């Protein structure tokens, strides 16, 4: 093996290691995993996501009009109730679609505020 081929192989291995370690922090779950002692599950999880989304909205400036703000909150609440129903349906199903999701990240593992805000629905000011 020539020196340049060896260098390329080492560089590729290092790149794969860096990519794997940066994505390795993702939570994965088994279907029968028990909740984390500091995990948030059920209705408190939906409330935590709602609070995180409202906090993110207020930090980003929100909307200038009260009516628009109320409409955005209604849309977010509808989205969060749909998310909660979907989580219940997926937990009841023996064949889950994937090992990741809000229940996996925040109930069966412990999640932080950034992970909670990943589940906020995209809401634009003009969609009211």
UniProtKB/Swiss-Prot annotation:
Residues 1-24 form the signal peptide. Keywords: Amidation, Carbohydrate metabolism, Cleavage on pair of basic residues, Disulfide bond, Gamma-carboxyglutamic acid, Glucose metabolism, Hormone, Secreted, Signal, Toxin. It holds the Pfam family Insulin. GO terms for biological process: glucose metabolic process. The keyword Glycosyltransferase does not apply. Residues 59-89 form a propeptide. Gene3D superfamilies: Insulin-like. One of its GO terms (cellular component) is extracellular region. Disulfide bonds join 29-104, 41-107, 53-120, 106-111. The modification 4-carboxyglutamate is found at residue 115. Its main location: secreted. The keyword Cell wall biogenesis/degradation does not apply. Expressed by the venom gland. The modification Serine amide is found at residue 127. SMART domains: IlGF. One of its GO terms (molecular function) is hormone activity. It is found in: Secreted. Heterodimer of A and B chains; disulfide-linked. PANTHER family: INSULIN-LIKE PEPTIDE 1-RELATED (PTHR13647:SF4), INSULIN-LIKE PEPTIDE 2-RELATED (PTHR13647). Belongs to the insulin family. This venom insulin facilitates prey capture by rapidly inducing hypoglycemic shock. Intraperitoneal injection of this peptide into zebrafish lowers blood glucose with the same potency than human insulin. In vivo, when applied to water, this peptide reduces overall locomotor activity of zebrafish larvae, observed as a significant decrease in the percentage of time spent swimming and movement frequency. This is Con-Ins F2c.
């Amino acid at each position: 093996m020539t020196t340049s081929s060896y260098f390329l192989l080492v560089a590729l291995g290092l790149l794969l290691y860096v990519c794997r370690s940066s994505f390795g922090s993702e939570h994965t779950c088994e279907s029968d995993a028990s909740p984390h002692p500091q995990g948030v599950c059920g209705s408190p999880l939906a409330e935590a996501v709602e609070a995180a989304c409202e906090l993110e909205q207020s930090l980003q400036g929100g909307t200038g009009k009260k009516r628009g703000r109320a409409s955005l909150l209604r849309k977010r609440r509808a989205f969060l109730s749909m998310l909660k129903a979907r989580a219940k349906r997926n937990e009841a199903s023996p064949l889950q679609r994937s090992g990741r999701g809000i229940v996996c990240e925040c109930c069966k593992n412990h999640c932080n505020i950034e992970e909670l805000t990943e589940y906020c629905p995209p809401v634009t000011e003009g969609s009211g």
